[in-house]
Regions:
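Conserved functional micro-motifs across diverse proteins
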Residues: 2-166
Length: 166
């Protein structure tokens, strides 16, 4: 009896050791999932992306064939994106429409361009802490059902935010 009891406690010890390892693994997995949530890089229309205190929200998207004075190339269209930028960091930040690109459904990526203006074109500048700016950026792209706006704040930085537009 004592011998059987000893064997039983040995198995319990092994079992509880395994359970402790499983709990530790789950805790590590949960932390991994939390990190993945914090590093979200894809957003939709009216969703705010936060990259080191720079908050960007794409609030509107319009497609245009231009006006009587300016038209896109044959097979292309203008995509006019309205966005808000807000500085939630404790230092000045810079912003520039050249930090934004558009990608069409074929994977072609293009820079902003001159197009039909609505007098609210986003220029470049700086924002102090809690500063805000909004404006439009015009892109010319091959006609596409879907677009993505890509934001890369600095060319030497590998951080990128994507806004999926429908």
């Amino acid at each position: 009896m004592i011998f059987a009891s000893s064997g039983s406690s040995s198995q319990e010890s092994k079992s509880s050791g395994s359970s402790a390892k499983t709990t530790a693994a789950k805790t590590s997995e949960e932390k991994s999932n939390d990190d993945a949530k914090e590093e979200k890089t894809e957003f939709g229309l009216n969703e705010t992306a936060d990259l080191d205190g720079t908050q960007i929200t794409v609030t509107n998207v319009k497609k245009s064939m231009g006006n009587e004075y300016i038209k896109p190339k044959n097979g292309n269209e203008y995509v006019v994106v309205t966005l808000n930028i807000e500085n939630k960091s404790d230092k000045d930040i810079s912003y520039n429409p050249l930090d934004f690109q558009i990608q069409n459904e074929d994977g072609q990526i293009t820079q902003n361009t001159f197009g039909p203006s609505d007098d609210n074109d986003l220029s470049s500048g700086n924002l102090t802490p809690n500063g805000k700016v909004s404006g439009t950026i015009t892109f010319e792209s091959k006609k596409s059902k879907t677009y993505k706006v890509l934001y890369t704040p600095e060319f030497w930085n590998d951080k990128k935010i994507t806004f999926n537009l429908q």
